[in-house]
């Protein structure tokens, strides 16, 4: 086994977790977590599920854990992180996860939550990619009082590729944040981000995404887009897309849009005899479901679409 190379090709400013106060707390207090390593050339043919269960007797507390995932050369893994919360009390989960994806390896990382919770969830993910490796992220979340995913992806060697797709359906006073920083540290790398939110009641969605391109990272191809459907006046969506580019031969774009349901589409569905409530759900489902189109595993895609439909229908 080769030693960890999590700081390879990364500037100290980009990789310094100690600037994050919750990471400092985690480094001091983390008591649990897991280490997962996939052997060279080994490809799991079924998804691996990490089941995070919070029991009803969990009282006010803070849980700190630290995880490590390593995919060795030419390995593949689909990992599903599933949150199931039964506690009605305030608590906090503070997680750190270090991911290393080595040459020609592929990791599909899927986050699912639709549990009602008064808890606070924060997760910091730092990933390092080698040549020809691929890191795909799919995020489906609804129901949490506060949830923040802080994702840093380092494309350290050429032809590495990363994607982040997110579908958030927020109700009541739910607050969800996604923060990404994609560091293009080598040439010929690709990154693609599409973040979608549907916001109702007094919910709030936040997206802050940064694409950083080093001078050496020529032929970079980077795309970033966030969209939000705001269903009433009290809901809120804040977006801060950023580009910081030092190379001159790149293709980079970013943008953010927000608005309400398209009334022409709604009228069309109603004119076909579909009740207004169901028409709303169909439009929301189509809007959020687009984030799963690039998922190649049909059985996993169908599972996620079913979960998404459950969130939209309040199940």
Can you say where each PLM-predicted feature lies in the sequence?
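Single conserved hydrophobic/aromatic residue that forms the stacking wall/gate
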Residues: 2-14, 18
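Conserved beta-strand/loop scaffold segments within soluble protein domains that form the structured core
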Residues: 15-274, 288, 295-315
């Amino acid at each position: 086994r080769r030693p960890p190379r999590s700081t390879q090709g990364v500037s100290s400013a980009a990789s310094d977790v100690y600037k994050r106060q919750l990471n400092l707390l985690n480094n001091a207090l983390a008591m649990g977590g897991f280490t997962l390593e996939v052997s060279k050339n080994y490809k799991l043919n079924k998804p691996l599920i990490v089941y995070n269960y919070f029991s009803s007797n969990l009282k006010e507390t803070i849980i700190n854990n630290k995880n490590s995932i390593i995919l060795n050369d030419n390995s593949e893994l689909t990992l599903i992180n599933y949150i199931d919360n039964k506690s009605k009390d305030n608590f906090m989960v503070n997680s750190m996860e270090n991911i290393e994806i080595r040459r020609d390896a592929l990791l599909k990382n899927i986050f699912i939550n639709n549990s009602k919770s008064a808890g606070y969830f924060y997760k910091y993910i730092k990933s390092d990619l080698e040549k020809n490796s691929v890191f795909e992220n799919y995020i489906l979340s609804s129901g949490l009082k506060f949830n923040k995913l802080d994702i840093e992806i380092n494309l350290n060697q050429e032809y590495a590729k990363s994607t982040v797709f997110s579908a958030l359906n927020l109700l009541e006073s739910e607050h969800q944040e996604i923060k990404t920083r994609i560091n293009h540290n080598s040439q010929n790398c690709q990154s693609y981000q599409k973040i979608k939110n549907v916001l109702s009641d007094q919910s709030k969605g936040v997206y802050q995404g940064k694409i950083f391109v080093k001078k050496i990272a020529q032929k970079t191809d980077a795309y970033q887009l966030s969209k939000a459907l705001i269903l009433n006046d009290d809901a809120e969506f804040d977006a801060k897309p950023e580009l910081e580019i030092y190379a001159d031969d790149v293709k980079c774009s970013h943008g953010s849009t927000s608005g309400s349901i398209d009334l022409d589409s709604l009228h069309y569905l109603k004119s076909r005899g579909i009740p207004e409530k169901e028409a709303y759900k169909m439009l929301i489902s189509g809007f959020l479901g687009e984030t799963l189109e690039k998922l190649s595993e049909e059985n996993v895609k169908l599972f996620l679409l079913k979960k998404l439909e459950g969130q939209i229908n309040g199940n």
